[in-house]
Amino acid sequence: MEKAVILGSLARSFPTDTLDKFRSIKGVIDADLLFGPYDFYVVAQAEEKVKLDEIALKIRFTEGVASTTTCNVVNKETLNLVRAHTWE
């Protein structure tokens, strides 16, 4: 299972239903507004990376979204590869 956290900025006059639009996207498991350098975060989950990319693009092109940064969560398989690697 692939997972990502999408951080984003909204246009100054963003629609009040933007979070509802995010939450209606299949694969979005959480979304909320933030204070700080980003205006919102979305947590998304999908079986394949390509589906996760599709979710990120849907969020990026939602009306009122000015920019996004997608952070892929390191899954257990990748973490095990990192742990097994010897850094010489």
Language model: regions and residue ranges:
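A compositional/biophysical signature of low hydrophobicity enriched in polar/charged and small residues
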Residues: 1-88
